[in-house]
């Protein structure tokens, strides 16, 4: 369901796939070829949420903000299943592993990988191109070429799947 909130209505690019049971409300912008999967909740009723191009937000994830703190997800990011994002910044090509929680003011660097089940506390900065995981998340090592290839494969698969499901919605 897509809901306005006060004067704000979600702005969703026509090439984006939005699962029928996803909920999006308020000041939310979603870029081209992005995919919002089943049972995702994106609330833009406190502050803006900005989602770039070719971003995939997987099943059961929840996105929200604190007052005056935008939630930003840059192009080509992957947000795994059942992730909670709250007023964070997710840079280009980053991957957030399933079940992770990223809190207010945290910044996940370009091409960084947050391992499944991690908790990134408020204000924590994960450097570009690094693997971090744990509760709280700690930087473990730079990503390998194999890590980067896996992340690219996942991104590409989700763009393809999203476009397939978008096609099904239109038939």
Swiss-Prot record:
The keyword Cell membrane does not apply. Keywords: Transferase. Pfam families: Hexapep (PF00132). InterPro entries: Hexapep, LbH_gamma_CA-like, Transf_Hexapept/Carb_Anhydrase, Trimer_LpxA-like_sf. The keyword Transferase applies. It is an enzyme of class 2 (transferase). One of its GO terms (molecular function) is transferase activity. Its EC number is 2.-.-.-. Belongs to the transferase hexapeptide repeat family. PANTHER family: DYNACTIN SUBUNIT P25, GAMMA CARBONIC ANHYDRASE-LIKE 1, MITOCHONDRIAL-RELATED. This is Uncharacterized transferase YtoA. It comes from Bacillus subtilis (strain 168).
